[in-house]
């Protein structure tokens, strides 16, 4: 489907006039005017196009997003104000009588008034939630439109000298509509929904978000980009607390000096319409991805894992996985083999009935998922991983991926397939044991990533001061929703998809930061977090979960055990500010 059609279908009618005028920009490019004899593209034409694109269309979208988001925040605050008298009345009713002795109590709303307020707030929350979803869709489709029209310009009117796509990406990296974090606002809405419903329906107070997280084992994942200039310092900060771990699916042990970090290969699946990609970019409920993954070279006969991950919420997912031998992968994809031998082996090992059934379910689910969605291997991601973790201690798990390369693995173009359609992987790569930087791969089939990818997984979202310091330092660039699968598809199949991840424009900027500027941004961010958490504190009736509180002890040693690095100087500044 052409992007112009996609844009028309995506328009939210009340905001129609505020979208990028894609048709007008195409007209300025004279893309569809094939009857015109003189197709000369003058400097005046170029200036008029760029002015309309950046000064008019981009400015229009930016201003609309900014004003709409502020209105949503104002509407949210108004709902909190309406609920405040009810929240205070609930707290006073639950508190011991002596707690309020001598205190002047404000009159509580009557039962009828309370119900009216709660119903009105719930109705308004539904409208706010709907508008937030529409605003996110609005931002994404406009972001994609700017990238698409810039590419059209470069193809028809550009060249190495007059290419504007990098300039457009750079401009968009600075505007809020492509990097707005809606999470704090959603957290406030969630608290009000919970409070209003339990008071309207008379239910016992359920566990707050903070309490429910503390009551179960879960991991909170934080993702960052690391500029190669900062990579060594980041590694040394981590390895002073956590040892480098040999990354192997069967064993875990501390790495020895002679060992190299292993390479990891993932082959991702999708269909010719890139349905799985679109679902993931648009954050659809139960968006899934499917991949084959192994460590090292395929010629070394590594264990190959079939893995399906389904996102349930922003921080939780359901995983299904099982090992499969090389020779069975293609028949499994085609539905000719159903892992009978593997099931038989497990049955003979006296595996528990529950584990055996789970294994069978994973096999059946993944095979039907392939068939129902017409999936094929489309993308290879290859990278080198350094892992940090105390063996046997999973409270903190950190990985750093470098030399990240994406390679087309598809057979979508029947005339020029990148992969033999009758095979599950590219033998020109694996038989030749190609490695980074994959110089033999044809142009257009390879994309590399300029930064290292840092991933920090913390059990139960526990705070560690040294991790908090690292995450908020100038050494890393936050990339909360970064996905290798999404980035690879967006980089190599941009003509096949009509939606892009917001982080693409950020790649055009220098992610290195001045330490002082980064520190000031951190303080402003924490102040904003505190304000948002304070707004819902009375509704949650529990201590707000703030990242600004002192961290816990490191899994290895004390967080105060620091050397003369940047983080030392940063800690000194924080101490001075608190004094």
Range-by-range predicted roles:
Residues 1-579:
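Phosphate-end processing signature that detects enzymes handling 5′-triphosphorylated RNA
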């Amino acid at each position: 489907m052409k992007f112009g059609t996609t844009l028309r279908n995506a328009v939210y009618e009340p905001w129609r006039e505020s979208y990028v005028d894609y048709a007008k920009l195409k007209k300025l490019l004279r893309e569809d005017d094939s009857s015109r004899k003189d197709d000369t593209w003058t400097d005046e034409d170029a200036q008029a196009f760029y002015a309309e694109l950046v000064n008019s269309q981009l400015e229009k979208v930016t201003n609309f997003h900014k004003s709409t988001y502020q209105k949503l925040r104002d509407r949210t605050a108004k709902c909190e104000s309406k609920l405040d008298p009810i929240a205070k009345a609930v707290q006073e009713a639950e508190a011991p009588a002596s707690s309020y002795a001598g205190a002047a109590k404000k009159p509580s709303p009557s039962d009828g008034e309370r119900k009216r307020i709660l119903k009105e707030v719930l109705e308004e929350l539904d409208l706010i939630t709907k508008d937030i979803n529409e605003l996110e869709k609005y931002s994404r489709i406009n972001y994609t439109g700017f990238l698409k029209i810039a590419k059209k310009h470069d193809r028809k009117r550009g060249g190495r000298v007059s290419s504007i796509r990098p300039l457009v990406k750079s401009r968009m990296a600075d505007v809020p509509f492509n990097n707005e974090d809606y999470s704090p606002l959603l957290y406030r809405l969630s608290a009000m929904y919970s409070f209003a419903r339990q008071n309207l329906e008379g239910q016992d107070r359920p566990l707050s978000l903070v309490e429910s997280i503390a009551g179960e084992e879960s991991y909170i994942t934080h993702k960052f980009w690391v500029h190669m200039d900062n990579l060594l310092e980041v590694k040394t900060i981590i390895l002073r607390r956590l040892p480098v771990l040999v990354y192997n699916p069967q064993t875990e042990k501390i790495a020895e000096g002679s060992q190299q970090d292993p390479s990891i290969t993932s082959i991702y699946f999708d269909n010719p319409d890139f349905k799985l990609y679109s679902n993931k970019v648009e954050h659809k409920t139960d968006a899934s991805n499917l991949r084959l993954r192994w460590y090292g070279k395929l010629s070394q006969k590594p264990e190959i894992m079939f893995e399906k991950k389904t996102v349930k919420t922003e921080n939780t997912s359901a995983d299904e996985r099982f090992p499969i031998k090389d020779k069975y992968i293609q028949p499994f994809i085609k539905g000719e083999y159903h892992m009978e031998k593997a099931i038989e082996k497990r049955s003979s090992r006296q595996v528990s009935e529950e584990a055996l059934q789970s294994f069978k379910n994973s096999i059946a689910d993944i095979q039907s998922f392939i068939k129902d969605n017409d999936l094929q291997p489309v993308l290879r991601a290859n990278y080198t991983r350094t892992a940090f973790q105390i063996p046997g201690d999973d409270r903190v798990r950190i990985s750093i991926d470098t030399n990240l390369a994406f390679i087309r693995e598809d057979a979508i173009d029947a005339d020029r397939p990148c992969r033999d359609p009758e095979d599950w992987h590219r033998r020109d790569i694996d038989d030749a044991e190609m490695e980074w930087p994959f110089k033999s791969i044809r142009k257009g089939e390879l994309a590399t990533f300029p930064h290292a990818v840092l991933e920090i997984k913390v059990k139960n979202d526990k705070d560690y001061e040294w991790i908090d310091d690292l995450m908020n330092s100038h050494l890393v660039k936050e990339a909360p929703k970064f996905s290798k699968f999404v980035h690879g598809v967006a980089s190599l199949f941009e003509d096949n998809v009509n939606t892009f991840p917001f982080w693409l424009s950020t790649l055009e900027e220098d992610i290195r930061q001045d330490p002082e500027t980064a520190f000031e941004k951190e303080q402003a961010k924490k102040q904003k977090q505190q304000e948002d958490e304070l707004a819902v504190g009375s509704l949650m009736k529990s201590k707000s979960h703030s990242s600004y509180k002192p961290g816990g002890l490191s899994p290895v040693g004390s967080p105060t055990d620091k050397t003369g690095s940047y983080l030392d100087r940063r800690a000194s500044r924080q101490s001075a500010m608190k004094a």
